[in-house]
Amino acid sequence: KDKNTTSGGLDKDYAFKYSVGIAETFTLLVPGIYGGSNGGNEYKTSEFADKMQQVGYPEDQALQYANGMSYWGQQQPTSGPVYFGAVIMLLFLFAMFFERGWLKWSLFAAGMFGIILAWGKNVEAVNYFLFDYLPLYKKFRAPSMGLVMPQLCFVILAVVAVNNLLFGDNSAERIKKAFKQTAIATVAIIAVLGFLYFSFDYTSPNDGRIKENMVGAMLQQATQQGQQPTAELQQQAEQFGKGFVTAIQTDRKGLFAGDLTRTVILLALALVVLWLASRKKLQPLPVMLILLVLSSFDLLTVGKRYLNDGSFVDPSDFDNAFAMTDADKMIKQDKGYYRVLNTTVDFTNESVTAYHHNSIGGYHPAKLQIYQDLIENQIGRNNIQVLNMLNTKYIIVQNPQNGQPVAQMNPGAFGPVWFVKGIKYVADGKEEMKALDSTNLRDTAVVQTKFKSLIANQPVADSTASIQLIENKNDIINYESNAASNQFAVFSEVYYTAGWNAFIDGKKAEIVKTNYALRGLAVPAGKHKIEFRFEPKSYKLGDTLNLVSSILVYLIVFGGLFMAWKTSKQA
């Protein structure tokens, strides 16, 4: 068995994509150690942006490009580092030397466990074991989420330590020893960070793409100007591209240096406050206020790199982003049920199309794996048969003359449901996906052999047979069929067993995984009403528990009021 495949869960490579690098954990203390993000506001000035301006890019756009390429860690892409704050981390460090007992070690252990989870594929022995054997763990795809555990535990421990320092009954010797150990540990950590600063190469896997783009741009410009491609010109272009890579790496190093300096200053200030508090030279209230101000300044200034005035838009500007194009208006004239593919954008990473139409694209971090497989193996390769089975009636393309989106009708779309003439059985999912390359999906359904038992009667061709969508209410979908013989229907809806149930004339029927990602149903001869209902057991159970809990709360409240009334009457 491939070590990257799992049953009932995500692929390992996919699930552990957002693993935090071990050295990257230092972003808890220095936010810019690995550059920050792929689209934040890290740079005010940038060598890379300066070079972009030299070749004609506007200043704002050049700086935007520089910010988009600042991150060079393992997680590609990312919207920013997980930063706890230098002040908070110093207080946590003090707590580790000052506090005693089970609370310290339990919070520390829980926090470190979260960090180990966040390391993901970098600690395979632990995390691959948990992925394979911890119930439901393989359903999640971002190990970096594990950092929420230390984010809670370390802060609690820091607050407990400050409270104990200011209001606890502690000997001067204990406080002095803890402060000294904290200061030594702080200097040691700064030394490690300094070593990393000088040892890092600040390279990213995307740097090669930057160089290639710049080399290509220079060669294209030279060709347009009539220059012949020569070895000398190629060498000049290589040096030109290399200059951009060197510039962005210099920017990354500068960001690390700036944030490291910032962290050292904050650590020093927090150490001074701790020293004053430990020597009783400041009262508790000023100590708490100073630490609060320092910590707030620390966190807010970093936070504004990623959430600032530029992150908000006027309501009118927001609405304009979803304004209908002429292509959208043309499609909206069709009142039928169909889907749309927008090729003018990255259809897997946009939402505007879905705002107006039933889109075959869109984005959600929690992806259905079978549909993701279909995107990567079929839709991404423009398999028209697969687009047809997804009921893609309209395709939005770019008009080469004016660059505007234009809608093209796809007359081959199969519609929301259809009967097939036969079934092609395959051994497994791999063969099922491969069969989509060459099978006439309008006439033949592709089904894995393990689902054959769910099809009581094989379909018999009937030219008069019909099946149609009556109503789609999202969670309830109704169809009607009429056939003189047994049929097999393919529904242009994604196969998802965790909640979807099928009924034929009110009797539950088995849904068959068909064409890798769709639903199939064996339909007996005659006239029938077919219904799909989304009825997840977890929702029904939660709804029932919510009702029971609400009733119990009301009983307790009214019971308490009744007892109080009864007691007052007796008095």
Describe each model-derived feature in a short phrase.
Residues L90, G361, K393, V447-A571:
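Active-site-proximal, structured, solvent-exposed surfaces of multi-pass membrane proteins
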